[in-house]
Amino acid sequence: MARLLLLTNSSSASADVMPALGLLQHDVKILPIEASVLVEPPVVDCLLIDARRDLPAAKSFTKLITSTGVDVPIMAITTEGGLSAINADWGIADVILDTAGPAEVDARIRIVIGKDAITQLANNP
């Protein structure tokens, strides 16, 4: 079970942002997309950024996160139409559609967390 932080400006539950999250056993904490979250971020394995509606704001926030030294993988949640706007400049580990099923969501979370763990071990032998 992974510890996830979902950053969203939606007032709904995580299952409304990405329905598959509601079916998985991960521990999901939800906070607003605000810079103040980065002052004392909770200990998590992965950040999920809600990029479904405001792509420019989501991109700016992912760049802010990477510039502050937060050292966990970031996944952007977007719609199919938003995929065309996302590129390497965002500084994210992965992107996933908000309509992805539970198996895909779980696999992608495990992969980005696993890759991050391997990178951490390689950088700190």
Locate predicted features.
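Extreme N-terminal starter segment of soluble prokaryotic enzymes
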Residues: 1-5
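Short, Lys/Arg-enriched segments at the junction into DNA-binding effector domains
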Residues: 114-125
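Conserved phosphotransfer microenvironments
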Residues: 10-16, 22-85
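C-terminal output helix
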Residues: 100-109, 113
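As written
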Residues: 88-93
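Detector for Asparagine
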Residues: 9, 87, 123-124
